[in-house]
Amino acid sequence: MSTWSSMLADLKKRAEEAKRQAKKGYDVTKNGLQYGVSQAKLQALAAGKAVQKYGNKLVLVIPKEYDGSVGNGFFDLVKAAEELGIQVKYVNRNELEVAHKSLGTADQFLGLTERGLTLFAPQLDQFLQKHSKISNVVGSSTGDAVSKLAKSQTIISGIQSVLGTVLAGINLNEAIISGGSELELAEAGVSLASELVSNIAKGTTTIDAFTTQIQNFGKLVENAKGLGGVGRQLQNISGSALSKTGLGLDIISSLLSGVTASFALANKNASTSTKVAAGFELSNQVIGGITKAVSSYILAQRLAAGLSTTGPAAALIASSISLAISPLAFLRVADNFNRSKEIGEFAERFKKLGYDGDKLLSEFYHEAGTIDASITTISTALSAIAAGTAAASAGALVGAPITLLVTGITGLISGILEFSKQPMLDHVASKIGNKIDEWEKKYGKNYFENGYDARHKAFLEDSFSLLSSFNKQYETERAVLITQQRWDEYIGELAGITGKGDKLSSGKAYVDYFQEGKLLEKKPDDFSKVVFDPTKGEIDISNSQTSTLLKFVTPLLTPGTESRERTQTGKYEYITKLVVKGKDKWVVNGVKDKGAVYDYTNLIQHAHISSSVARGEEYREVRLVSHLGNGNDKVFLAAGSAEIHAGEGHDVVYYDKTDTGLLVIDGTKATEQGRYSVTRELSGATKILREVIKNQKSAVGKREETLEYRDYELTQSGNSNLKAHDELHSVEEIIGSNQRDEFKGSKFRDIFHGADGDDLLNGNDGDDILYGDKGNDELRGDNGNDQLYGGEGNDKLLGGNGNNYLSGGDGNDELQVLGNGFNVLRGGKGDDKLYGSSGSDLLDGGEGNDYLEGGDGSDFYVYRSTSGNHTIYDQGKSSDLDKLYLSDFSFDRLLVEKVDDNLVLRSNESSHNNGVLTIKDWFKEGNKYNHKIEQIVDKNGRKLTAENLGTYFKNAPKADNLLNYATKEDQNESNLSSLKTELSKIITNAGNFGVAKQGNTGINTAALNNEVNKIISSANTFATSQLGGSGMGTLPSTNVNSMMLGNLARAA
């Protein structure tokens, strides 16, 4: 006979034997259940329809003659049952006694009758009298003030809940009538529920023993595949972590005592094969020292009945148990303790600063971890039992009833655990809340505000180096620093857990004073009238007697008041809604008589209102109104609308410190100097500081708290039409944003800085000073004596009519002037194009390959060894007297030659392609222009005239040393003197430097002199001297320039 045939025969034999055993067990069970029922058979059959109707409901049965006045809240129990929808049935005592006798429920308050699941009122009443502690355990979440009725509801609904778990899927009405395994299961579940409730009530503190069990569990799990990390974390749970001295451990220990007692293995003599078949041996190997068993009744009657113990079956059991254990559940347990430890360490610092809220939060997570560890460990053990049993009975004919039975009982216990967890966690949270109430009653202060105070003290300690440096950074004697302590997650979490979110604010603002690198502990005398009221939006530092910085160190929430209300939105859900009554502006009164700096860049001026597809993001704007004093002030603006009244002095407004949007600065309608309207586009990629409403969620078991609060974020506005509008009064100088800005000057003097971005600056009328700064900018001076500085980038500078000073800076720039004035054109680095006008111009190409065109008038060109390949094209008149100054060349180092119609000069040390100066069309005849440079002067003052060169090239048109064409005067002082006169006349007139006064420009004279010095010293002849004078007023005279020329010539 083949192996396969043998296996089939053996399987058939085993199946027949199992069938006989099952029938035998069924007959015994049926006979046992029918015992005592025969006397009530007619009543049971007559109640068949009632059973179908009420078989899955819980009924509170009360004898009609029972005296509830002697019980413990008996009438409260009746009322609670009615409120919960549980049927209350009054019956004759004889009828009740028959039911008790027939179904074996005489000594229990919970049982089965033909009515279904039944709570027997007298037994329940007596039980509550005997075990009053059960009311405290199950009802601890309700607090001391809750009525007896509510406690009774909690007790009955709890029993109802756990019964629903264990009896799910069981058709009780059929089970009661027909008997069989389902009825046995139901009876066992009800019996165990009664036993557990009783044991929980009588529980004692066994928490220390449980600590050891968790640690042993961790050691065993560490060796299990894939669970090593979990095991190591569980071993870190020390005995102190589960100390019975903590909050709420009286409840936890009672629960553990009852559950572990229910799992005591009564049949210690059960065979090893029986344990293996049931899955207990393997589950013990994985779970460790936590006892997992069921009653001897279940073990003897079900699990030992013919279950396979072969190797494949054992492997199936092992794998099923492994899947039943949830590593994530134990990681959550360990995370609770780790979070408690983490917050506890964090709390130590703030406890020293006067706030112990973090310690309370740590205690909560410590106790929540204890509760979670208890319930998770036991639930995992239950899962292992159920999984092992199901796997072991997979091939048995009696497997389905066994699996159903064990699953039902483990589900019942899990239901009790889950029902008990929420009251325990709420009990812990309530104790913490009481501590907060006691503190507030003692100190008369908001507990959570005290937490913000402690956070701010820590901020001052941590940021002292930065905060104390602001005086020096902003060049003021004193700093008034405003800091917003924003929403704190730990403080918010504590408020949520304790249900006190309505007593919490979104943060708190603080004012601190720094002087000479020190924090002033008390408000200085001259700040006696400092006002900072974030609820009204008022700031006043007008009484300051020193130069002062007003700075918002961190983003400041919009002004206004907050209110909160906590409401319940579900069975376990609560939300604390925030209502903000905001102000529409900040009003700042600045220092009266001293210069000050106002850094508003962290002022939040947009509060988010709503979002829609059609309109995008919508905001409530808070306008800034700032009244400055009579000193020289600096104002750094934020992204919202502003109204600046600068007062006397030279005042500067900055838009470049933060993202302030695309600017259009318009002074064309100004009737007085310093008045501008500014429009700012805040759409597109512009990022703004906006105030938003956020929420923080915290959980206490099933209870979830949502707290709304104000916070801020730096983000794109999300509104294509969002704009800001500024009005500037008495502002002398404006620095643009880092985007593409447009400046429209007034008819008065304007001082504009483009900052970053490709900007358009138009000075219009007036003697303007325009700075392109970074980017490819276009600067137009228009009418007036203007100063134009291109800065970095490829810029276009148009001086217009008047005496203008143009400096291209780095990049490939184009410089052009109009009219017949005196102009200075400096190319700087890069390949530049310089176009003079009909007047007398100074053209200095600087480094790079430049093109210089002087136009009409007597122009002055500069060339040096670092200039690169330059081309000069002078289209002047025959009466012009143009000059070329070779700043660091002597004639004996230069070669000159005629190339086509051009005169070419280059150093005899350079190649043909580098360091070449070409004077275009020098030799061209027959047109109306004079393309010659009338005089060429070297660094020694030796002079070469156009006539000399013309005569020589007629006779010997070849390359030769330029010295051969020069006049014989060596280092002729008179030649240098004529250069001094030319330069002095151009420089002192260009850009109106010569009449610059403090009241008109506000530009530091030393800075202007530095710019002039750059022009002069670019010719090496002038490099060893500086313009004299450091005060304001008229710049140095021609004699100073003469001295420079003479000294440098002699030095050469």
UniProtKB/Swiss-Prot annotation:
Gene3D superfamilies: Serralysin-like metalloprotease, C-terminal. The chain crosses the membrane at residues 248-265, 275-334, 372-418. This is RTX-III toxin determinant A from serotype 8. GO terms for molecular function: calcium ion binding; channel activity; toxin activity. GO terms for biological process: killing of cells of another organism. It comes from the Bacteria. Does not have hemolytic activity but shows a strong cytotoxicity towards alveolar macrophages and neutrophils. GO terms for cellular component: extracellular region; host cell plasma membrane; membrane. It is a multi-pass membrane protein. SUPFAM superfamilies: beta-Roll. Keywords: Calcium, Cytolysis, Host cell membrane, Host membrane, Lipoprotein, Membrane, Palmitate, Repeat, Secreted, Toxin, Transmembrane, Transmembrane helix, Virulence. Hemolysin-type calcium-binding repeats lie at residues 744-761, 762-779, 780-797, 798-815, 826-843, 844-861. The gene is apxIIIA. It is found in: Secreted; Host cell membrane. The lineage of its organism: Bacteria, Pseudomonadati, Pseudomonadota, Gammaproteobacteria, Pasteurellales. Belongs to the RTX prokaryotic toxin (TC 1.C.11) family. InterPro entries: Hemolysin-typ_Ca-bd_CS, Hemolysn_Ca-bd, RTX_C, RTX_pore_form, RTX_toxin/Mannuronan_C5-epim, RTX_toxin_determinant-A, Serralysin-like_metalloprot_C.
